[in-house]
């Protein structure tokens, strides 16, 4: 059975991961393979640490999306893939990989998954999580400080220099490609339940 490929996009801190986790919970983790686009950031080990921090991580070129497309094609053919494991504190790929087995549903989440045409067009369902900019910034600030060892000053500087401009140039315009736009992210239980019900229905149809 050909898997259902789902893309979940939206600005940084919009609630993409929360929505993805809620869908996973409602549909059943045994039915879904989850892949974060963040895992495909390009390895910057060839750069000095101070130069790595200056890279624009919110530009499509910072991600190896062509590798993700290849992995999705492999999963669609029923083959397992080894996805990269990225270290956000050093901005490098580790020597480890994470094995993702084929599943009836493959869910990919990331801010730029609708920007590259080849990646965007591979999805059967495209969801865009739409959340106010101030809420997204606060969430990103808290995440980067707690999980990625960043300072308040560094997060604010990055937000103003690259995150916000790239959101306006790439992320926000990609919303027009979405099949469903979900306001307020993980707090929109009705929308999440509707999406989960649709996925369950598609799985039942394909099982017949």
Where are the model-predicted features located?
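Post-Walker A helix-loop "phosphate-sensing" segment adjacent to the P-loop in P-loop NTPases
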Residues: 25-33
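Conserved lysine of the Walker
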Residues: 16
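Hydrophobic positions on the alpha1 helix immediately C-terminal to the Walker A/P-loop
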Residues: 19
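Conserved nucleotide-sensing/catalytic segment adjacent to the nucleotide-binding pocket
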Residues: 33, 42-90
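The conserved Walker
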Residues: 12
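Phosphate-binding/switch loop-helix module in NTP-utilizing enzymes
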Residues: 71-108, 113-114, 200, 206
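ATP-dependent NMP and nucleoside kinases share a basic, alpha-helical "lid"
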Residues: 94-148
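NTP-dependent small-molecule kinase module
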Residues: 101-102, 142-145, 164-208
């Amino acid at each position: 059975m050909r898997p259902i490929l789902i893309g979940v996009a939206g600005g940084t801190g919009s609630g993409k991961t929360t929505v993805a986790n809620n869908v996973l919970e409602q549909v059943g983790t045994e039915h879904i393979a989850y892949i974060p686009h963040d895992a495909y950031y390009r390895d910057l080990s060839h750069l000095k640490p101070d130069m790595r921090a200056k890279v624009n991580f919110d530009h499509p070129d910072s991600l190896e999306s062509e590798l993700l497309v290849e992995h999705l094609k492999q999963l669609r053919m029923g083959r397992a893939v080894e996805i990269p494991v990225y270290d956000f504190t050093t901005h490098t790929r580790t020597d480890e990989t994470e094995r993702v087995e084929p599943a009836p549903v493959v869910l990919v989440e990331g801010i730029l998954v609708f920007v590259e045409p080849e990646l965007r067009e591979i999805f059967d369902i495209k969801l865009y999580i739409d959340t106010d900019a101030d809420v997204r910034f606060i969430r990103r600030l808290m995440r980067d400080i707690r999980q990625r060892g960043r300072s308040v000053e560094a997060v604010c500087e990055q937000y103003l220099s690259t995150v916000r401009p790239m959101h306006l140039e790439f992320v926000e315009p990609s919303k027009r490609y979405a099949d469903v736009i979900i306001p307020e992210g993980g707090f929109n239980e009705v929308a999440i339940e509707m999406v989960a019900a649709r996925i369950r229905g598609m799985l039942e149809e394909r099982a017949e």
